[in-house]
């Protein structure tokens, strides 16, 4: 239950596991579990039984959560995975900054 370093709609790159080097958008963050769900990463096959909402049933594909330690923020300017630092601007707002190039997120 550590603090998650990425937020919803951030672009991230997977740094380990079967989907290593895939780039995707964070769909949701699960802070109590320390996991994130990334678009088109860790896609699992689920056999859905027919029920009232889904009368057809069948096989569906959906993204499963992965640990947040396996993803890094992706900087569009650097075109690579990067660490971030927090910076306070003159007007008092706190922004996230790329450690490599200084670009704000």
UniProtKB/Swiss-Prot annotation:
GO terms for biological process: translation. The keyword Acyltransferase does not apply. One of its GO terms (cellular component) is ribonucleoprotein complex. It comes from the Bacteria. InterPro entries: KOW, Rib_uL2_dom2, Ribosomal_uL24, Ribosomal_uL24_KOW, Translation_prot_SH3-like_sf. CDD domains: KOW_RPL26. Pfam families: KOW (PF00467), ribosomal_L24 (PF17136). Keywords: Ribonucleoprotein, Ribosomal protein, RNA-binding, rRNA-binding. One of its GO terms (molecular function) is structural constituent of ribosome. Signal peptide: none annotated. One of two assembly initiator proteins, it binds directly to the 5'-end of the 23S rRNA, where it nucleates assembly of the 50S subunit. Part of the 50S ribosomal subunit. This is Large ribosomal subunit protein uL24. The gene is rplX.
């Amino acid at each position: 239950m550590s603090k998650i370093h990425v937020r919803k709609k951030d672009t991230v790159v997977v740094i380990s596991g079967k989907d290593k080097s895939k780039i995707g958008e964070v769909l949701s963050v699960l802070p109590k579990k320390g996991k994130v769900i990334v678009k088109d990463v860790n896609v699992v096959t689920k056999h859905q039984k027919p029920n009232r909402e889904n009368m057809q049933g069948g096989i569906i594909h959906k993204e499963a959560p992965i640990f947040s330690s396996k993803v890094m923020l992706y900087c569009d300017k650097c075109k690579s995975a990067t660490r971030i630092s927090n910076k306070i601007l003159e007007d008092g707002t706190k922004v996230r900054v790329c450690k490599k190039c200084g670009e704000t997120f």
